[in-house]
Amino acid sequence: MLSKEYKMIYITGDTHGNQYKWVEQIESVISPADIILVCGDFGVGFWNGRYWSEETFYDFLSEQKYTVLFIDGNHENFDKLYSYPTETWCGGRVHKIRQNVIHLMRGEVYCMEDISIFVMGGGYSIDKHLRTEGISWWSQEMPSEEEYNHALENLKRINYKVDYIITHTAPSETVYYLSTLRSLGIKNDVVQEQQLTIFLDEIQRKVTYKPV
């Protein structure tokens, strides 16, 4: 459980290690005891900024009164991310970057005060051809078979009932629908990600969750 009662949970998308965006757009609205949850591409390994190193920025976050939660996307340094200690937090496994900066691991279920959350990070980098393995791209960006199975086991354990589901990419049916909205510029041709998006379709059908 959380050590203190939260006031508000804010959910945002990719921050990509952008210190300026964090300070200007997030720091200005969040309050003590709030939670901010980043739905992947938090940017582990990419937080080196003009003024602060990555670890110094994490130290800055650790001095704040709010809690930073994030799932992984495809733009993370997974070697660095997996180097942090694994602990149990709110009933699920996490990597603790700092005491209040916490990576929610794939396939875990967390009970935070009065809500439960299932998370499934990961995604495929469509810009992989522009990146270098081990420097700006990591093969762990897509879930492993072990992680898929672990997710299903956890959902079965809670009878496929959870309040909220947090992912980085979307179920394949949603991706297809979004691709029909030409103004968004979303394509439905990333076959390398289909194992994950089809898996999320299955989760969406099986799990009872709250509408947003």
Question: What spans do the regions from the language model cover?
Answer:
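Core catalytic region of metal-dependent phosphoesterases/phosphodiesterases
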Residues: L2-E5, T12, N18-M112, K206
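Active-site-proximal loop/helix segment associated with metal-binding centers of metalloenzymes
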Residues: G92, Q99, E113-Q195
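Short, flexible loop segments at the rims of nucleotide/cofactor-binding pockets, characterized by
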Residues: T12-G17, V44-G49, Q140-E145, N188-Q192
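Short hydrophobic/charged patches on amphipathic alpha-helices used for structural packing
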Residues: E27, L152-K156, D201
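Structural motif
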Residues: M8-I9, D34-I35, I115, D163-Y164, ...
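Short, charged N-terminal beta->alpha structural module
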Residues: L2-D14, D127-I135
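Histidine-centered active-site/metal-ligand motif
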Residues: H16, H75, H168, V212
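Cap/insert and terminal regions of metallo-dependent hydrolase folds
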Residues: V44, N48-K65, D163-P211
